[in-house]
Amino acid sequence: MPPYTIVYFPVRGRCEAMRILLADQGQSWKEEVVTVETWRKGSLKSTCLYGQLPKFEDGDLTLYQSNAILRHLGRSLGLYGKDQREAALVDMVNDGVEDLRCKYITLIYTKYEEGKDDYVKALPGHLKPFETLLSQNQGGKAFIVGDQISFVDYNLLDLLLIHQVLAPGCLDNFPLLSAYVARLSARPKIKAFLSSPDHVNRPINGNGKQ
């Protein structure tokens, strides 16, 4: 039986980064898909610590909060930098990813039609810090922190992939980020996952907007 279980809605949402991570690390996991109808009944929601999904099970450990789950996997699988300095940088970058993801979620679920143009115009300013970070690490030819992959690489990759759907060409003026996405997406296990029905057929968001 797979050691990990993801309990979530039938979307990529906040779980696709951890799925990409698990796939790339050769880990197996089980999906328990929760429909909106089931969720609205309230019985599952009442058992969730913060009243929200995802819920993640690692053996007898149950976790909520997607970034806590990513950090747990980072520690468990050696994806948290090679020392405390790198771990601090990984945390910093992950907070930056979360900031932009929250902006994206607000756009998708509350003001997509009226807010998309302004969001896309402001997007370069939000992407620039990640380009800068890459430029400061081995000329952008490695990972976002250090010389080995960390959990934040998977989170950033997912964030960039969904923004390429929202705003095709958004990385055209960011050559390091563009190469970074191509490089990570070409890793054999990530490439296989991104081309699999599990990824391709799963909507990005729950309301059909992307």
UniProtKB/Swiss-Prot annotation:
<dbReference type="Pfam" id="PF14497">
    <property type="entry name" value="GST_C_3"/>
</dbReference>
<keyword id="KW-0597">Phosphoprotein</keyword>
<keyword id="KW-0539">Nucleus</keyword>
<keyword id="KW-0443">Lipid metabolism</keyword>
<dbReference type="Pfam" id="PF02798">
    <property type="entry name" value="GST_N"/>
</dbReference>
<feature type="binding site">
    <location>
        <position position="39"/>
    </location>
    <ligand>
        <name>glutathione</name>
    </ligand>
</feature>
<feature type="binding site">
    <location>
        <position position="14"/>
    </location>
    <ligand>
        <name>glutathione</name>
    </ligand>
</feature>
<dbReference type="GO" id="GO:1901687">
    <property type="term" value="P:glutathione derivative biosynthetic process"/>
</dbReference>
<keyword id="KW-0963">Cytoplasm</keyword>
<dbReference type="GO" id="GO:0006749">
    <property type="term" value="P:glutathione metabolic process"/>
</dbReference>
<feature type="binding site">
    <location>
        <begin position="65"/>
        <end position="66"/>
    </location>
    <ligand>
        <name>glutathione</name>
    </ligand>
</feature>
<dbReference type="InterPro" id="IPR050213">
    <property type="entry name" value="GST_superfamily"/>
</dbReference>
<dbReference type="GO" id="GO:0005829">
    <property type="term" value="C:cytosol"/>
</dbReference>
<feature type="modified residue" description="Phosphotyrosine; by EGFR">
    <location>
        <position position="4"/>
    </location>
</feature>
<dbReference type="InterPro" id="IPR003082">
    <property type="entry name" value="GST_pi"/>
</dbReference>
<comment type="similarity">
    <text>Belongs to the GST superfamily. Pi family.</text>
</comment>
<feature type="modified residue" description="N6-succinyllysine">
    <location>
        <position position="103"/>
    </location>
</feature>
<dbReference type="GO" id="GO:0005634">
    <property type="term" value="C:nucleus"/>
</dbReference>
<keyword id="KW-0496">Mitochondrion</keyword>
<dbReference type="InterPro" id="IPR036249">
    <property type="entry name" value="Thioredoxin-like_sf"/>
</dbReference>
<comment type="function">
    <text>Conjugation of reduced glutathione to a wide number of exogenous and endogenous hydrophobic electrophiles. Involved in the formation of glutathione conjugates of both prostaglandin A2 (PGA2) and prostaglandin J2 (PGJ2). Participates in the formation of novel hepoxilin regioisomers. Negatively regulates CDK5 activity via p25/p35 translocation to prevent neurodegeneration.</text>
</comment>
<dbReference type="GO" id="GO:0004364">
    <property type="term" value="F:glutathione transferase activity"/>
</dbReference>
<feature type="binding site">
    <location>
        <begin position="52"/>
        <end position="53"/>
    </location>
    <ligand>
        <name>glutathione</name>
    </ligand>
</feature>
<feature type="binding site">
    <location>
        <position position="8"/>
    </location>
    <ligand>
        <name>glutathione</name>
    </ligand>
</feature>
<dbReference type="InterPro" id="IPR036282">
    <property type="entry name" value="Glutathione-S-Trfase_C_sf"/>
</dbReference>
<dbReference type="GO" id="GO:0006693">
    <property type="term" value="P:prostaglandin metabolic process"/>
</dbReference>
<feature type="binding site">
    <location>
        <position position="45"/>
    </location>
    <ligand>
        <name>glutathione</name>
    </ligand>
</feature>
<protein>
    <recommendedName>
        <fullName>Glutathione S-transferase P</fullName>
        <ecNumber>2.5.1.18</ecNumber>
    </recommendedName>
</protein>
<feature type="modified residue" description="N6-succinyllysine">
    <location>
        <position position="116"/>
    </location>
</feature>
<dbReference type="InterPro" id="IPR010987">
    <property type="entry name" value="Glutathione-S-Trfase_C-like"/>
</dbReference>
<dbReference type="GO" id="GO:0005739">
    <property type="term" value="C:mitochondrion"/>
</dbReference>
<dbReference type="InterPro" id="IPR004046">
    <property type="entry name" value="GST_C"/>
</dbReference>
<dbReference type="InterPro" id="IPR004045">
    <property type="entry name" value="Glutathione_S-Trfase_N"/>
</dbReference>
<dbReference type="GO" id="GO:0051122">
    <property type="term" value="P:hepoxilin biosynthetic process"/>
</dbReference>
<comment type="subunit">
    <text>Homodimer. Interacts with CDK5.</text>
</comment>
<feature type="domain" description="GST N-terminal">
    <location>
        <begin position="2"/>
        <end position="81"/>
    </location>
</feature>
<keyword id="KW-0808">Transferase</keyword>
<feature type="modified residue" description="N6-acetyllysine">
    <location>
        <position position="128"/>
    </location>
</feature>
<dbReference type="InterPro" id="IPR040079">
    <property type="entry name" value="Glutathione_S-Trfase"/>
</dbReference>
<feature type="modified residue" description="Phosphothreonine">
    <location>
        <position position="62"/>
    </location>
</feature>
<feature type="domain" description="GST C-terminal">
    <location>
        <begin position="83"/>
        <end position="204"/>
    </location>
</feature>
<keyword id="KW-0007">Acetylation</keyword>
